[in-house]
Amino acid sequence: MDDWPERYSAALELDLTEEEGDAILGLARDVAHATERRFAPLSAYLAGKYVARRVAAGANSADAVHEAQEVVGRLLAE
């Protein structure tokens, strides 16, 4: 089911670029490998909430995803 992200985002009537999908998957991967695996889905969910809040405030979604990645990187480096 390689087309799962496209199918799911379409069913939710959301736009998901390949870059955004790759970034969120990378974020989840980093969390899964550096902490407990079970935190990866929760981290992806929280990143999504953060992105939605930033976009509602006028930010670009790609920039907001990048910001969420930076926060993960910073926290995992501590």
Language model: regions and residue ranges:
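C-terminal structural segments of small proteins and small subunits
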Residues: 58-78
